[in-house]
């Protein structure tokens, strides 16, 4: 933020500070810091997942949500996502632990929303055995709804037990 003059009644102006770029096939667009409200929405969305609250999750995403999972699976639409989550919650009891989130604005008219890049660990419990992955999610939020996200994943080693020392 900067002032338009050095007077006591100066107007404060919002200024986008360049923070990288995004390339498409046809152009390159500047990035700047995005709206913190998008990070807060994503945190609430993850909290709803940890609580396995399908009603809240569905209220926070667009009808046409697209999810590109780390295993190459593409899920399109709320109904398909709800069905997927219902089964996954029962089978693996997933739990997320966020460790960073950054909102980014693409200065491009075709994307008026905010991207959130989020780092988190995801712990699954299948047949009593826990496994954890480190993940990065790129999330697009527009009009107060999660529109799409990509997840990139890395397997983390199992913690060493006290017996192995």
Each language-model region and where it sits:
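Sec/Tat-exported extracytoplasmic proteins
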Residues: 46-53, 61-65, 85-93, 126
